[in-house]
Amino acid sequence: MIRTSSHVLNVQENIMTSNCASSPYSCEATSACAEAQQVMIDNFVFFHMYNADIQIDAKLQCGVRSAAFAMIDDKHLEMYKHRIENKFFYYYDQCADIAKPDRLPDDDGACCHHFIFDAQRIIQCIKEIESAYGVRDRGNVIVFYPYLKQLRDALKLIKNSFACCFKIINSMQMYVNELISNCLLFIEKLETINKTVKVMNLFVDNLVLYECNVCKEISTDERFLKPKECCEYAICNACCVNMWKTATTHAKCPACRTSYK
């Protein structure tokens, strides 16, 4: 949808324009909003990472989000001749196996004062990337949103431990919080785009419906139905669970009576 969504936004713009007379906003404002949404889509930095399973594959989602941190890491290598080495400032994705640190490391009583300088370098890398974005691709800062939230939490932990560097840490926090606020503005625009696309997709001819032969419920999500193991009889996951609850040994297909695994 990313590369063909211009029709969506053009239609939205026409709808907005036709309602200008009754809207509290000017026609120019609504038109500019639609144009900004289109620009945000057309210049998205990771549009090439689309995969048909991206909405259901957690590993793919993790890979896309991690690509944003890789951009920061690459910039760190470019600016400081080495990659980010402090694991405290790594990106820990919500779908990954490793949880993010919730406190500063205290092994062997090692000093963590250098964490402040590590954070400064990382933030400088983000600033360099951000400043390179022009007006048309400014929306790409949204890709840093997951990492910025982790960085905000990390700075809070550091601030509580090193009161002597309050001003330096406070300055970093102000920048990170401001960038997070900018990300939230773009997320709001993205939510508007998503709502419009969902409505427009109702008019696409290739819409597939999945119906359970037991309860007759219908869904547009292919995961709604249990994978077929025996015959073509379709059964949803909820009905399958109910069959297992009432089965003496194994649940069986209502059509061919084959036992489910």
Swiss-Prot record:
Chief location category: host cell
Keyword field: DNA replication, Early protein, Host cytoplasm, Host nucleus, Metal-binding, Transcription, Transcription regulation, Viral DNA replication, Virion, Zinc, Zinc-finger
Subcellular location: Host nucleus; Host cytoplasm; Virion
Zinc finger (RING-type): 212-257
GO molecular function, one term: zinc ion binding
Any one biological process term the GO annotation gives: viral DNA genome replication
Cellular component, GO, one term: virion component
Keyword Cytoplasm carried by entry: no
InterPro entries: Baculo_IE-1, Znf_RING
Quaternary structure note: Interacts with proteins C42 and FP25. Interacts with host beta-tubulin. Interacts with Ac66 and vUb.
Function: Putative viral E3 ligase that plays an essential regulatory role in both viral DNA replication and transcriptional transactivation. The role in transcription has been shown to include activation of gene expression from early viral promoters. Also promotes the efficient egress of nucleocapsids from the host nucleus. May act as an E3 ligase that promotes ubiquitination of nucleocapsids proteins by vUbi and subsequent viral egress for the host nucleus.
Annotated protein name in UniProt: Immediate-early protein IE-0
Species of the source: Autographa californica nuclear polyhedrosis virus (AcMNPV)
